[in-house]
Structures are given as C-alpha cells and as structure tokens.
C-alpha cells in the first residue's frame, strides 16, 4: 500500500510538472514518468499452464549423481518449495505432500526409469510435474574465485494416462547478476540459496497468474 502511495505521489508530481511545461517537452516528461513508474512497479503475468486446476499432482526432481553429491539438499528443497507453491496457487484438488513424496522416492530409487503412467498410479495422482536438472553450479569449472552460478533444467508435465508430456519448458536462471563477486563478498550458501529461490520462482510461476517487476533480474 505504501509503495503504491509513493508511486502515486511521484506520478502526481510529475503530472503537475508536465502541465506547466512547454508543449514540446510534455512528451519527454510523460515518457520519463512512465519509465519511472515501470522501474518501481510490477505487472501481472498470466499462467502458461493451468492444467493442474481440479487435478492431483506430484513434483519429481531428478539430477545426476555429481549434482546430488555436491548439493545433497538441492532436490529435496526444490521438491518441497515447488510442491507447496503449486498446491497453494493452482487450484489443484490433491497432491503428494513433500515429506511423504521424498520418503517414497528414497524407498523406490528406480523411480527415474519407471514409466510415467505407472509412477502416477503408484503415487495416486492425475499429473506429474517432472524437473530434470541438467546443471547446478556456483562457478565455472576451474574458477573458484569468482561466482558464476547457474541453475538449469527441463520442466515437463505428464498426465497419468500417457508418457508424452502435455507441457514442456526450459528453466534457466543465474546469479550473481554482475561480475566480480567472489567468496569475500558472498558465501557459497548465499549463492546456492538465491539460485534455488530463482529456480523455484521460474518453475512455479508457469502454473499461475503472478506479479513480476517490469524489468526482472531473472
């Protein structure tokens, strides 16, 4: 509320200035007002996939062994956060809670090679949201002095009756947003935390209407 009030005050002041300005300057002032407003405001982005509405689902996150070894909490964190977000915002009527899902996956390590219809039946859901991580790094190989984090993967939605995905998107986020940051400025935990948060946002936002800055950082 305070943010919108502040934006309104700035906009009102700029309008008063525009009214008092010569005709040729009004266009420039109005353009600057609009740009200033965008820089401090958000816009509504529509969902790209609404098929979880009225359905039950489970989120499955897969990564290679090296990634699992380097970041053992990565898959559980992504599974939990994305599952929670989708259940809260998509209108889904059922889900497999993250704690139960992670326990089931631990007890059934061959799930990665199990056909989607069989997996959906085992989990008792209508749809599977499958995330295959193909990269999660904090820096370029061989350069541990400069952070250059990246989290990337493929998100697919597969219905319980078939193996062909009904929705597929590539997710690719990075951090930091500028060069020159190393362990003296940011810890490895901070870089990993921001990467995971951004990946969760970009994965989850595909499924429901949400607000984003006009000029997002990721």
Segments (PLM) and residue ranges:
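Bacterial N-terminal signal peptides that target proteins for export
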Residues: 1-11
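C-terminal motif of bacterial Sec signal peptides marking the signal peptidase cleavage site
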Residues: 20-23
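"Short basic amphipathic alpha-helical interaction patches in structured regions
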Residues: 74, 144-148
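C-terminal/domain-edge helix-coil "capping" segments
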Residues: 25-54, 119-123, 147-150, 156-218
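Short structured motifs
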Residues: 44, 114-116, 137-140
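N-terminal segment of the mature soluble domain
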Residues: 53-134, 160-168, 194-211
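Extracytoplasmic/secreted cell-surface and envelope-processing proteins
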Residues: 69, 138-143
């Amino acid at each position: 509320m305070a943010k919108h009030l502040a934006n309104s005050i700035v906009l009102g002041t700029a309008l008063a200035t525009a009214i008092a300005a010569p005709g040729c300057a009004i266009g420039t002032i109005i353009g600057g007002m609009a740009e200033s407003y965008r820089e401090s405001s958000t816009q509504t982005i529509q969902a790209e996939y609404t098929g979880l509405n009225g359905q039950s689902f489970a989120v499955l996150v897969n990564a290679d062994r090296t990634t699992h070894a380097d970041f053992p909490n990565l898959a559980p964190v992504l599974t939990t956060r994305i599952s929670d977000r989708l259940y809260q915002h998509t209108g889904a009527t059922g889900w497999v809670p993250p704690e139960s899902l992670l326990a089931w996956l631990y007890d059934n390590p061959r799930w990665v090679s199990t056909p989607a219809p069989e997996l959906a039946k085992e989990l008792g859901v209508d749809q599977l949201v499958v995330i295959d991580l193909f990269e999660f790094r904090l820096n370029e190989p061989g350069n541990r002095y400069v952070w250059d984090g990246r989290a990337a993967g493929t998100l697919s939605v597969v219905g319980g009756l078939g193996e062909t995905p009904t929705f597929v998107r590539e997710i690719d986020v990075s951090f930091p947003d500028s060069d020159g940051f190393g362990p003296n400025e940011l810890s490895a935990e901070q870089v990993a935390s921001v990467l995971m948060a951004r990946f969760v946002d970009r994965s989850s936002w595909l499924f429901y209407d949400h607000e984003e800055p006009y000029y997002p950082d990721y």
